[in-house]
């Protein structure tokens, strides 16, 4: 037997004796027997992964420390959308580095997510107040993709009858790059200048532009209004604390990055973008929206609102494929605003603006030409032929400035900038700054009349802030409390050793456009990761740029699109997608300019190979791609996977392999060997990046050799087709995956996959006598997850799948995935990290719930008044003076057998009213004046 270093044993939940007991329960002599039964022999990898041998936690941290020590951290004045920040330690320690925050899942289950939902609600309130627009989503991926998403909203608003987009000012180059990538397959015409015509869907107004200048856009905005075009403002949220809100001057939408609200640059990410819209655009805004509703007892409660507009419902008709966003970073930004309050934010903004104004004045006095008269934090200077020399001198002094071209440099100030920086930078131009606090921003009209809500005024001491964050997170159930058995989500351990490097100075505080020679640590770390992921998947090339799984899908499909175009077959636009696919699949295909044709599935859950063959042959002249999830979304290894790929290839298409379920394959099989041409990997699932309560995520893609030339490029690297603002996307959290692979090694990764499959089959075995297990493969085995059919409780007792999900909260669990991919069922994925004790506790709870349903069926409890129909039960409900239910208080909150009373989780609210919340949408907190 392979001897595993301590980390492998720490990561995998079941002990050796547990593994033996679970295999015995399945009637199996060994793990190898289980894997032979579950995984088709035709796809098995018959060799060990060629990865570096596993290291201990201490050794891996030391090795990564040496690598990242090659980075040279200098003070950045590059700007271009990325700024130095002071992350308040109270936020870093109590939120960013707190597993109670970062291990939580997207808050679909409202009752166990009230803390992070509340903070995201404050984020939306912050954005609405800054922009003057009434509706904001709970974050997007980055500023560049947010601009593209806003353009998509504008086109949808015009029912796709207008296709021209006018960029009315100079956006950051990376934003233009991403917009151009998005435009090509969707047929958007991207124009610059000030000419608004009848085909213009929207104008995009940078506020300020990439040079730091606030232009005069009054006429083009008036023309847009006259022509019915929407106005999109790309606005700096720190500047908006001292400037007129975009809605005041005509913006219908506003977007930007919240990075400078306490989130480190991280060599490009992750950061939360914002998007706010007018009320008329509410129902086509992309991303999550947190709304306020009430629970069953009339208490205020938060929930995700208007979900029917999202990709998992509307599929290829959705406005966007956005799924995972940047919830953790949005919560950091909200906490930053709560910590500083409006006066503190204005003080930061005014100081930054004053430094920039004094720098501009000094340069002017020295005879240096600068761009524009109105500016906030950035000064762009004309230095004919001297840009490189001046930047080099700044570099020698430990400061980085932006080289725009051979004759132009930019200097951007932020909250970390000092008087010493100002003097040193001015001296590079032969200038000397003078005193003063004048600022040069236009329309300096915003006073104290914003962020008047109490939450932005109540937490000035660290004691108050620490307790505020604790009160919020105590409302939630995350992996630090209990198992989160969500099918297709892979909620595995996010080990402390993996997380620690994210906060290192050499990881967190580099600008993504820093000189290449100063980021050699990142170059080595990302190169390692690309090579390891290639080995794990079998592909020839990897791009780490996509900053979510949905963006990986999009990037992969765009690579296929560009491949066909390069071969003179750009007419290929049909994408075959199984009816069981994730909702992001058809949404991504639509964004990539493809038309979706649905392939049927058989009653046993497998893809109907005859239907696939017929449709592939029917569309052989136009077939672009086939998207398949493997193991299937039903949690089964389909025997015919290689035949599926052959059919697609025989008809001129490419195979897109959705890597959502890669946790069932690592070390056992490789997508490329199976026949895939491209695959995205969810690093926030299989490779241990935490879900953060709804993001960040990372979705790199691996591609076969013929697709390598079509991987996403980046303007900073001299190439095109970027899908994210930064070349390496959410670069700073890639160290998490680096650490995971380095500490597991090839044998450890394979062992983790085997443990995940064992845990899922053990659950299926324990529950199959009570609930039907819907889909199984050969030998009655499942892959790494199983679908439990709770409809038997509906048939016998009227108990719905929602009743079961909410009752599991009383037992201390996050519910499994509900009603997907089959309505009325629960899909359970335990991952390899859960110990047998916790798995048994979940199984005991599910069996006990079936027993409770039987009491309803037998008439012991009424159908409308029983522990399941009334779940979950709060402490206040349980302690009410009157208890009129036919079951006891103990039965409500301390259910026997499966329950550990010492680990009781108390939900803060009872069942939330979802319908009422959508009918009466409240997605930001009204200002204090609204109550007057």
Swiss-Prot record:
Annotated keywords: Oxidoreductase, Pyridoxal phosphate
- Signal peptide region: none
Query: What GO biological process term is on the record, naming one?
Result: glycine decarboxylation via glycine cleavage system
Query: Could you say which EC number(s) this protein's record lists?
Result: 1.4.4.2
Catalytic activity of the protein = N(6)-[(R)-lipoyl]-L-lysyl-[glycine-cleavage complex H protein] + glycine + H(+) = N(6)-[(R)-S(8)-aminomethyldihydrolipoyl]-L-lysyl-[glycine-cleavage complex H protein] + CO2
Q: What residues bear N6-(pyridoxal phosphate)lysine in this entry?
A: 685
Q: Name one GO molecular function term.
A: pyridoxal phosphate binding
Pfam family, any one: GDC-P
Give TM segment ranges. Answer: none
Q: Which cofactor does it need?
A: pyridoxal 5'-phosphate
Spell out the GO cellular component terms annotated for this protein, sorted alphabetically and separated by semicolons. cytosol; glycine cleavage complex
Record text on subunit structure and interactions:
The glycine cleavage system is composed of four proteins: P, T, L and H.
Q: Which family does it belong to?
A: Belongs to the GcvP family.
Q: What is the protein's known function?
A: The glycine cleavage system catalyzes the degradation of glycine. The P protein binds the alpha-amino group of glycine through its pyridoxal phosphate cofactor; CO(2) is released and the remaining methylamine moiety is then transferred to the lipoamide cofactor of the H protein.
Enumerate the PANTHER family for this protein: GLYCINE DEHYDROGENASE (DECARBOXYLATING), MITOCHONDRIAL, GLYCINE DEHYDROGENASE, DECARBOXYLATING
What is this protein called in UniProt?
Glycine dehydrogenase (decarboxylating)
């Amino acid at each position: 037997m392979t001897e595993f270093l301590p980390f492998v044993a720490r990561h995998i939940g079941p002990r050796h004796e547990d593994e033996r007991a679970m295999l015995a329960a399945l009637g199996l002599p060994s793990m190898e027997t289980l894997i032979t039964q579950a995984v088709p022999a035709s796809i098995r990898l018959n060799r060990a992964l060629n990865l570096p041998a596993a290291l201990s936690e201490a050794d891996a941290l030391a090795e990564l420390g040496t690598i990242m020590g090659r980075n040279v951290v200098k003070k950045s004045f590059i700007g271009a959308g990325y700024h130095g920040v002071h992350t308040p330690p109270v936020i870093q320690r109590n939120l960013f580095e707190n597993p109670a925050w970062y291990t939580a899942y997207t808050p679909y289950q409202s009752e166990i997510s009230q803390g992070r939902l509340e903070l995201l609600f404050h984020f939306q309130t912050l954005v609405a107040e800054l922009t003057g627009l009434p509706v904001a989503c709970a974050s997007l991926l980055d500023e560049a993709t947010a601009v593209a998403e806003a353009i998509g909203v504008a086109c949808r608003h015009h029912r796709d009858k207008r296709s021209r987009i006018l960029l009315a000012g100079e956006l950051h180059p990376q934003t233009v790059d991403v917009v151009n990538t998005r435009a090509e397959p969707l047929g958007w015409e991207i124009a610059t200048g000030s000419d608004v015509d009848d085909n213009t869907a929207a104008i995009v107004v940078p506020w300020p532009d990439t040079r730091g200048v606030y232009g005069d856009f009054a006429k083009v905005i008036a023309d847009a209004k006259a022509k019915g075009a929407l106005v999109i403002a790309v606005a700096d949220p720190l500047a908006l604390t001292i400037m007129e809100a975009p809605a005041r001057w005509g913006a219908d939408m506003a977007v930007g990055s919240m990075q400078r609200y306490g989130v480190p640059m991280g060599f490009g990410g992750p950061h939360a973008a914002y998007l706010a819209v007018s009320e008329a655009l509410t129902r086509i805004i992309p991303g999550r929206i947190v709304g306020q509703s009430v629970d069953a007892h009339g208490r205020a409660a938060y929930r995700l609102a208007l979900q029917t507009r999202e990709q998992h419902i509307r599929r290829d008709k959705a406005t966007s494929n956005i799924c995972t966003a940047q919830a953790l970073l949005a919560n950091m930004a909200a906490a930053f605003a709560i910590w500083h309050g409006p006066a503190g934010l204005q003080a930061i903004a005014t100081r930054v603006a004053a430094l920039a104004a004094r720098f501009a004045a000094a340069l002017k006095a020295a005879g240096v030409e600068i761009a524009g008269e109105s500016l906030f934090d950035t000064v762009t200077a004309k230095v004919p032929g001297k840009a490189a020399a001046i930047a080099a001198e700044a570099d020698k002094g430990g400061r980085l400035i932006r080289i725009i071209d051979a004759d132009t440099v930019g200097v951007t100030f932020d909250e970390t900038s000092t008087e010493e920086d100002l003097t040193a930078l001015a001296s590079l131009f032969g200038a000397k700054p003078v005193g003063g606090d004048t600022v040069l921003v236009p329309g300096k009209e915003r006073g104290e009349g914003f962020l008047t809500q109490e939450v932005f005024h109540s937490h000035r001491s660290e004691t108050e802030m620490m307790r505020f964050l604790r009160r919020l997170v105590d409302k939630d159930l995350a992996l630090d409390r209990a198992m989160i058995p969500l099918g297709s989500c892979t909620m595995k351990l996010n080990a402390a050793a993996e997380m620690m490097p994210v906060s290192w100075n050499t990881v967190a505080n580099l600008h993504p456009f820093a000189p290449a020679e100063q980021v050699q640590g990142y170059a080595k770390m990302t190169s390692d990761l690309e090579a390891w992921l290639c080995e794990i998947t079998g592909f020839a090339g990897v791009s780490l740029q996509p900053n979510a799984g949905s963006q990986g899908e999009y990037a992969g499909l765009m690579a296929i699109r560009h491949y066909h175009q390069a071969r003179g077959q750009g007419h290929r636009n049909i994408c075959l997608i199984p009816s069981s696919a994730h909702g992001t699949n058809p949404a991504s295909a639509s964004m990539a300019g493809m038309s979706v044709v649905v392939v049927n599935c058989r009653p046993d859950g497998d893809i109907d190979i005859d239907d696939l063959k017929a449709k592939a042959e029917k569309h052989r002249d136009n077939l672009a791609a086939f998207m398949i999830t493997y193991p299937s979304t039903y949690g089964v290894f389909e025997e015919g996977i290689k035949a599926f790929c052959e059919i697609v290839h025989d008809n001129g298409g490419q195979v897109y392999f959705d890597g959502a379920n890669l946790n069932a394959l690592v070390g056992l099989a490789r997508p490329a060997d199976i026949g895939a041409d491209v695959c995205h990997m969810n690093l926030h699932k299989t490779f241990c990046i935490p879900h953060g309560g709804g993001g960040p995520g990372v979705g790199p893609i691996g591609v076969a050799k013929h697709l390598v030339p079509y991987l996403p490029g980046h303007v900073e690297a001299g190439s095109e087709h970027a899908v994210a603002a930064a070349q390496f996307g959410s670069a700073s959290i890639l160290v998490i995956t680096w650490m995971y692979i380095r500490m597991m090694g090839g044998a450890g990764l394979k062992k983790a996959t085997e443990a995940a499959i064992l845990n899922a089959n053990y659950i299926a075995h324990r529950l199959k006598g009570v609930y039907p297990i819907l889909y199984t493969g050969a030998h009655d085995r499942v892959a790494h997850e199983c679908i439990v059919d709770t409809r038997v409780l509906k048939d016998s007792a009227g108990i719905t799948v929602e009743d079961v999900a909410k009752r599991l909260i009383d037992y201390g669990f996050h519910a499994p995935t509900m009603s997907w991919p089959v309505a009325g069922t629960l899909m359970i994925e335990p991952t390899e990290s859960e110990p047998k004790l916790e798995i048994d506790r979940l199984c005991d709870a599910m069996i006990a719930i079936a027993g409770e349903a039987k009491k309803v069926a037998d008439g012991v409890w009424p159908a409308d008044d029983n522990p399941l129909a009334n779940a979950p039960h709060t402490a206040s409900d349980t302690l009410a003076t009157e208890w009129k239910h036919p079951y006891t208080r103990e039965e409500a909150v301390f259910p026997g057998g499966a329950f550990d009373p010492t680990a009781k989780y108390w939900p803060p609210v009872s069942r939330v009213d979802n319908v009422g919340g959508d009918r009466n949408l409240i997605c930001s907190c009204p200002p204090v004046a609204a109550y007057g």
